[in-house]
């Protein structure tokens, strides 16, 4: 009851830089239910597909907030006036768990460049860990829109470390963080560490972290569910 009350208070205080897409009922809820459900999530194809679907929904919602310019398109019967993105974002994902969400984002923003970053936890004790960023492949990121995806925003430390590593490739014009599940603790850390204009888009917000920094109720290990148990 205490965690639920804390979550309700936190959600009430959210500013417009945090978008919780579970606040209103939509088909997103079905995909969220399936990635969480222990009777469904062990099908890796279905799990990856649902992460892709969640990312597509987030991408569509983000697409409403970026800048467009009007163009003329010649059809077989005449001229149509349409809108085209003024600045294609760069889609950045955290390996390996973020790959499925990256595919969903790329399906929506299909003309975009991509960047890939490895970030993992090294546990020094059951409750303590360090974040390592060892691999980064990216285009020029200076003055560009970044969309950084990862299924789980648990502590926020990986996201912050990845953001800081990406700064070697340039400073962003705008940052979007796209995740399936986030915690209040992670949201607060990311908001303190990233630019004030950074937006966090999440499929849900869960109130609790275990002593090992796993989200409750969460869904388990997204990378293992999507791509197999690592050793």
Go through the PLM ranges and name each one.
Residues 5, 9-231:
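PRPP-associated nucleotide enzymes
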